[in-house]
Amino acid sequence: MTNFTHINKQGNAKMVDVSNKEITKRVAEAHSSIIVNEKIYSQITQNTNSKGNVLNTAQIAGIMAAKNTSTIIPMCHPLPLTGIDISFKWDSNNDDSYRLNITAVVSTTGKTGVEMEALTAASVTALTIYDMTKAIDKGMIIGETYLESKSGGKSGDFHRKN
C-alpha cells in the first residue's frame, strides 16, 4: 500500500515538511484547451470583445492563479516562483469550431515542484476565456488539462508519452 505524504499517523491532513529537501531548479509544463465557435474565435483573434483583450486577460489570470496556488489548494506550499509563461496556439476542428491550446510553463528554484502551479495556471487561463466569452456561447468545452513535463527534484524528470 502506498503511504500518502499528506496524511499523518492519525489519518489527518498535513502539509509535508520540505525543509530537508535539496534546493534545485524546477520547471513544470501543463496544458489545457478550450473549444469555441467561429464567432468567439473571430472576436478573440480580432480583439473585439467588449470586456477587453481576451488572451491578454487570460494570461494575466493564469499568472495570478499560479502565484496563488497555495491559497486555493490546501497542501501546496507557497513558492517563490521565478517564471510563468502562458502561450496559445489555435487549431481548427474543421466543423465550425476552433480549439485554443493553452500551455503554461512555471519555474522556481526551491525545495518542491511547481506542477500544481502550472496546472492551476492552465486551468484558470481556460476558465477566464470561458468567462469573457460566455455571453456569445455557453456551449464551449474546456478540454483535458494535464501535466506535460516536469524537471528537477528528487523524483526526477517526467515527460508525458502520447
UniProtKB/Swiss-Prot annotation:
InterPro entries: MoaC, MoaC_bact/euk, MoaC_sf, MoCo_biosynth_MoaA/MoaC, Mopterin_CF_biosynth-C_dom. CDD domains: MoaC_PE (cd01420). This is Cyclic pyranopterin monophosphate synthase. Catalyzes the conversion of (8S)-3',8-cyclo-7,8-dihydroguanosine 5'-triphosphate to cyclic pyranopterin monophosphate (cPMP). Keywords: Lyase, Molybdenum cofactor biosynthesis. Pathway: Cofactor biosynthesis; molybdopterin biosynthesis. Pfam families: MoaC. The keyword Lyase applies. It catalyses: (8S)-3',8-cyclo-7,8-dihydroguanosine 5'-triphosphate = cyclic pyranopterin phosphate + diphosphate. Gene3D superfamilies: Molybdopterin cofactor biosynthesis C (MoaC) domain (3.30.70.640). NCBIfam families: moaC, PRK09364.1. The active site is at 131. GO terms for molecular function: cyclic pyranopterin monophosphate synthase activity. The keyword Ribonucleoprotein does not apply.
